[in-house]
């Protein structure tokens, strides 16, 4: 009788421990990469929310994170995202090509997309939650399809950054060409004016 009682007690204890462990939030690794092409720096404030704004009267974040970088470096981080997070809100602060500071807010619905990309001014940011939502919590690159998704996301991000740099170079070259052309036209005009005055 005592042995049966102890066995029931042990089973109850094991069930209680298992129940507590199941209630603990699982998490997945989220990858974020950010490029800021301005010397004054860019800032991204990240708020992890339980529900999207239309579905909840409370926008109090479960937790927050801030990224601050500058000078065109590519910075990468990984963040543990718990399963109770459904939406991630980004507040971007970055200067544009004229040096004016831009502040913009955007959100990433984790239930609708595994990847995220946003560009504003001199800042580009890409995010990836590999293998679907909480598909492989401990090893984000757990299989071939996962690796393919991450590689495609990184490739798209790098291509967009290179395209932005190329456009910026072309724009600067175009401005330099126009400036040189105007200087030549002004010089020719002055020479013609001087020649006309000497002729008279």
UniProtKB/Swiss-Prot annotation:
The chain crosses the membrane at residues 148-168. It is found in: Membrane. GO terms for cellular component: membrane. This is Uncharacterized protein F02A9.1. The lineage of its organism: Eukaryota, Metazoa, Ecdysozoa, Nematoda, Chromadorea. Residues 1-19 form the signal peptide. It is a single-pass membrane protein. Keywords: Membrane, Signal, Transmembrane, Transmembrane helix.
């Amino acid at each position: 009788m005592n042995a049966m009682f102890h066995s029931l007690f042990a089973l109850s204890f094991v069930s209680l421990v298992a129940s507590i462990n199941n209630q603990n939030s699982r998490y997945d690794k989220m990858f974020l990469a950010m490029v800021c092409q301005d010397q004054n720096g860019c800032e991204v404030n990240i708020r992890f929310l339980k529900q999207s704004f239309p579905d909840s009267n409370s926008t109090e974040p479960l937790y927050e994170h801030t990224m601050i970088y500058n000078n065109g470096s590519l910075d990468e981080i990984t963040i543990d995202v718990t399963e109770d997070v459904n939406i991630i809100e980004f507040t971007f602060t970055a200067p544009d090509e004229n040096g004016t500071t831009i502040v913009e807010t955007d959100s990433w619905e984790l239930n609708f997309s595994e990847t995220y990309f946003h560009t504003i001014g001199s800042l580009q940011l890409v995010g990836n939650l590999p293998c679907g939502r909480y598909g492989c919590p401990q090893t984000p690159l757990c299989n071939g399809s996962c690796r393919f998704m991450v590689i495609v996301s990184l490739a798209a991000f790098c291509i967009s950054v290179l395209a932005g740099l190329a456009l910026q170079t072309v724009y600067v070259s175009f401005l330099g060409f126009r400036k040189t052309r105007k200087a030549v036209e002004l010089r020719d005009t002055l020479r013609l004016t001087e020649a006309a005055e000497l002729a008279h």
